[in-house]
């Protein structure tokens, strides 16, 4: 059964939008999988997987190809839609420091979340698309090409599901684990520091699973394999495009994704950094997790804004 109608800009029909998103996402999957196999990607993109080691991390030809595919696809399908398109790859040209975009409706895209994992061949990468309305993500899409999983989360009806290329759907299945010592943590392969290790020691969670990509991490929570993901900013911080789509899907699945003080995540605020101690969970023990994390961070890093 498909979810009931969601809130979209005037003139945007849910059924057609979801169909277009499916087409664009599976096209993006074809591009990434071809690059991953060293083959000629479809749609005329260059075969060479060139990599620019930028200051914010590597940017590959695959990032740029999927970015163009998604932006062009949305623009062509909806030339008169009342929304603005923003992606990780266009942010430098579009954004002015300290100023939000003048957009009631805003698409925030990450064409390749987990570029390092993609280049390393782990398969743990994702594509993120989020539709944001007045700072809140109201539609989230997370694509995991190698797993052939396409996740959707729609506000306000609180429905989240995944589907494969054949359109077969399954609802999210969050775990029922409750005691903190039983919760399974999903953590990054590449972003760990001493403060995070101290925080995890204070929380005394259960097992840990290492996965690349924020979307990939949240997908393990959606499948019930893990329960908690923690993002702790330091010299750098995740950005709007890292968090918006996974947060929307997890929230609509019945989970939670907030700051440790319980504040919700907001987007297009004039600062794309999602700084602080951010906690994503299956929701069952979220308040306890947040309270314990906030108290621990007060000892570990006094003055740190969670």
Please give the residue ranges for each predicted region.
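N-terminal subdomain of lithium-sensitive/metallo-dependent phosphomonoesterases centered on the IMPase/IPPase/PAP
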Residues: 1-112, 198, 285, 302-306
């Amino acid at each position: 059964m498909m979810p009931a109608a969601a809130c979209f800009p005037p003139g945007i029909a849910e059924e057609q939008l979801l169909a277009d998103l499916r087409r664009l996402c599976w096209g993006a999957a074809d591009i990434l999988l071809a690059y991953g196999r060293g083959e000629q990607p479809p749609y005329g993109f260059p075969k060479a997987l060139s990599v620019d080691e930028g200051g914010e991390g590597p940017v590959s030809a695959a990032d740029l190809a999927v970015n163009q595919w998604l932006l062009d696809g949305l623009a062509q399908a909806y030339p008169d839609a009342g929304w603005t398109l923003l992606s990780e790859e266009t942010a430098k040209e579009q954004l002015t420091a300290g100023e939000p975009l003048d957009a009631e409706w805003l698409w925030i895209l990450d064409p390749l979340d987990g570029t390092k994992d993609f280049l390393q061949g782990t398969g743990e990468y994702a594509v993120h698309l989020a539709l944001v309305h007045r700072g809140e993500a109201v539609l989230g899409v997370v694509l995991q090409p190698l797993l052939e999983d396409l996740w959707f989360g729609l506000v306000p009806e609180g429905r989240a599901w995944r589907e494969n290329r054949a359109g077969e759907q399954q609802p999210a299945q969050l775990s029922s684990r409750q005691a903190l010592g039983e919760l399974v943590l999903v953590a990054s392969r590449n972003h760990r520091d001493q403060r995070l290790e101290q925080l995890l020691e204070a929380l005394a969670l259960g097992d840990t699973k290492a996965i690349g990509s924020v979307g990939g991490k949240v997908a393990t929570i959606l499948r019930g394999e893990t329960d908690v993901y923690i993002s702790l900013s330091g010299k750098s911080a995740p950005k709007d495009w890292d968090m918006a789509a996974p947060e929307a899907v997890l929230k609509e699945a019945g989970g939670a994704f907030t700051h440790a003080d319980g504040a919700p995540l907001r987007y297009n605020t004039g600062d794309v950094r999602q700084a602080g101690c951010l906690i994503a969970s299956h929701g069952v023990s979220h308040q306890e997790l947040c309270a314990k994390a906030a108290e621990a961070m007060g000892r570990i890093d006094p003055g740190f804004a969670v």
